[in-house]
From Swiss-Prot:
Record gene name: nuoI
Entries under PROSITE patterns matching the protein: 4FE4S_FER_1 (PS00198), 4FE4S_FER_2 (PS51379)
PANTHER family linked to this entry: NADH DEHYDROGENASE [UBIQUINONE] IRON-SULFUR PROTEIN 8, MITOCHONDRIAL, NADH DEHYDROGENASE UBIQUINONE IRON-SULFUR PROTEIN 8, MITOCHONDRIAL
Matches recorded under NCBIfam families: NuoI, PRK05888.1-4
EC number of this enzyme: 7.1.1.-
Domain of life: Bacteria
GO MF annotations in UniProt: 4 iron, 4 sulfur cluster binding; iron ion binding; NADH:ubiquinone reductase (non-electrogenic) activity; quinone binding
Entry protein name: NADH-quinone oxidoreductase subunit I
Major site of localization recorded for this protein: membrane
Amino acid sequence: MKKVYHYIIHYVRTYLLLELLAGLWLTVKYFFRKKITVQFPEEQTPLSPRFRGLLALRRYPNGEERCIACKLCEAVCPALAITIESEQREDGSRRTTRYDIDMFKCINCGLCEESCPVDSIVVTPIHHYHISERGQNIMTKEKLLAVGDLMETQLAADRAADEKYR
């Protein structure tokens, strides 16, 4: 009797394709559920307030750049993506002559932002940028300052909202 039972079970599993029907049932079940896919260019999910996107350099309200060339961000960068050159000014303070970030090396860890004593380098919520030619991966001081000027109002508001956590 056990042998006949074994043959019946083998027949049902082999010829009725129960595994295939179970897989098809799972597919049909999900086919009629609400879709969770986001059509990216047209629709976007909301970003976290602490999202780390494109880097920027900020200025003081009088227009002077904030960076004091302490090179802490260059020292703390684990990917060695930041290159800084500086010189002394007439008044004795240091300012950067070159501030480059290689975006191919940058891992968006945010350590440069945390180490900056004057809030000069910051991360922005910009995540739509592309590189179409060789050499565009280097964010120069001018590009970084331009991004900072563009985003200054939002960056200041984000800093004010995040102040109690810093």
